[in-house]
């Protein structure tokens, strides 16, 4: 009698790749809703556009590689890549921004290396960095949070309607012919600066941290809107941990290193750096810690390595935010840490039993 012997590993996860990707998208919903509430419907428009483009590119590349496209589409990895890139760009960014970004993410950063499971770098972050370096104006032109405008700190002379929003994204002009620059000029106050950007600009102009934080955009812990967006992604990340979709090592390493670095410099250089709470709840901190850095393909594979990997990202995020040329450093930090993964895994691989 012959028996079928399966190859190792013999222990399998109950969750398949499509299941994991669905959980990631589901747990990112709170953050998406928070962004939509604070920054308008443009976030949802960018997401729908991104998913459509990403799935189309995924299918075309698979056909070009003479492989069945439906198998790749069913793993939902392209959907997650589109999701992460869509929430990282300004809601009013023109349609070609997300298109160029997804071309880099799907075609170059993913399939050029062999497809799912073969890419050494996070595809969404590759796309984001390419866009940020190539089109800095479009990628840093965030609108003011809607509650800040409604509170009267910034007065919109001609509010942007949903029709104007769609027209701006796809044609570059509103229905009545106004450009995005003219729309922003119609709002008095800080319209294109995130709290991180405003804080760094203030420091460069010679203001102290306390003077900068007195501006209306910094109301709350880490800036109007952004603190709640980060808390929403934190809630989604905790669900991912509870469902064992991700492990705790990378988020703890990331947030722990960022907390230690910001606490140290806030204690000894209080007028030159933001508070730890500001760093934890501003920018893409929670999105990066739970949804980006935890990419199982491009992250470290050992337990000690994952903690070190997260700590490297957290440290680099603080360094780039404090002394770099860009307001936030999550994307650059993740890619630099991706480069270190082979070295991290080599020196943190577990000792073989008996040796």
Swiss-Prot record:
Q: What is its main location?
A: membrane
Modification FMN phosphoryl threonine occurs at = 194
Which range is the signal sequence, renumbered to this chain?
none
The EC number(s) given in the record are 7.-.-.-
A Gene Ontology term for the protein's cellular component: plasma membrane
Highest taxon of the lineage: Bacteria
Which keywords has UniProt assigned to this entry? Answer: Cell inner membrane, Cell membrane, Electron transport, Flavoprotein, FMN, Membrane, Phosphoprotein, Translocase, Transmembrane, Transmembrane helix, Transport
The record's listing under InterPro entries reads: NqrB/RnfD (IPR004338), RnfD_bac (IPR011303)
GTP-binding is among the record's keywords:
no
Q: Which Pfam families match?
A: NQR2_RnfD_RnfE (PF03116)
User: What topology does the record note for this protein and the membrane?
Assistant: Multi-pass membrane protein
Write out the GO biological process terms. electron transport chain; transmembrane transport
What are the transmembrane regions?
23-43, 44-64, 78-109, 129-149, 221-241, 250-270, 273-293, 307-327, 328-348
Q: Subcellular location, in the record's words? A: Cell inner membrane
Cofactor(s) the protein requires to work: FMN
Q: Which family does it belong to?
A: Belongs to the NqrB/RnfD family.
**Quaternary state and partners of this protein?**
The complex is composed of six subunits: RnfA, RnfB, RnfC, RnfD, RnfE and RnfG.
Q: What does this protein do?
A: Part of a membrane-bound complex that couples electron transfer with translocation of ions across the membrane.
What is the protein name stated in its UniProt record?
Ion-translocating oxidoreductase complex subunit D
According to its UniProt entry, this protein's organism is Vibrio vulnificus (strain YJ016)
The gene that this protein is the product of is rnfD
């Amino acid at each position: 009698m012959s028996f079928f012997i399966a190859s190792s590993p013999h222990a399998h996860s109950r969750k398949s790749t499509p299941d994991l990707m669905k959980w990631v998208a589901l747990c990112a919903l709170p953050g998406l809703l928070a962004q939509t509430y604070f920054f308008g419907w443009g976030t949802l428009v960018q997401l729908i556009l991104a998913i459509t483009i990403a799935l189309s590119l995924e299918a075309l590349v698979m056909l070009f590689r003479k492989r069945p496209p439906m198998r790749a589409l069913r793993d939902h990895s392209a959907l997650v890549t589109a999701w992460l890139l869509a929430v990282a760009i300004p809601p009013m960014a023109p349609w070609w921004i997300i298109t160029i970004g997804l071309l880099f993410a799907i075609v170059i950063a993913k399939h050029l290396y062999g497809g799912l499971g073969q890419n050494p770098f996070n595809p969404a972050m590759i796309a984001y960095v390419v866009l940020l370096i190539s089109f800095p104006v479009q990628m840093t032109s965030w609108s003011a949070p809607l509650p800040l405008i409604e509170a009267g700190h910034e007065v919109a002379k001609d509010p942007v309607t949903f029709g104007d929003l769609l027209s701006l994204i796809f044609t570059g002009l509103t229905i009545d012919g106004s450009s995005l620059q003219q729309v922003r000029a119609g709002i008095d106050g800080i319209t294109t600066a995130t709290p991180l950007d405003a804080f760094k600009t203030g420091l460069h102009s010679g203001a102290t941290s306390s003077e900068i934080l007195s501006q209306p955009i910094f109301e709350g812990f880490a800036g109007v809107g952004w603190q709640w967006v980060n808390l929403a992604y934190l809630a989604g990340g905790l669900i991912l941990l509870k469902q064992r979709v991700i492990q705790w090592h990378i988020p703890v390493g990331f947030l722990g290193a960022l907390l230690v670095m910001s606490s140290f410099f806030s204690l000894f250089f209080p007028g030159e750096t933001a508070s730890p709470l500001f760093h934890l709840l501003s920018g893409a901190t929670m999105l990066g810690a739970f949804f980006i850095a935890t990419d199982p393909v491009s992250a470290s594979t050992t337990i000690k390595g994952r903690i070190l990997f997260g700590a490297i990202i957290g440290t680099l995020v603080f360094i780039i935010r404090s002394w770099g040329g860009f307001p936030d450093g999550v994307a650059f930090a993740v890619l630099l840490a991706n480069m270190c993964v082979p070295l991290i895994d080599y020196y943190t691989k577990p000792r073989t039993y008996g040796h």
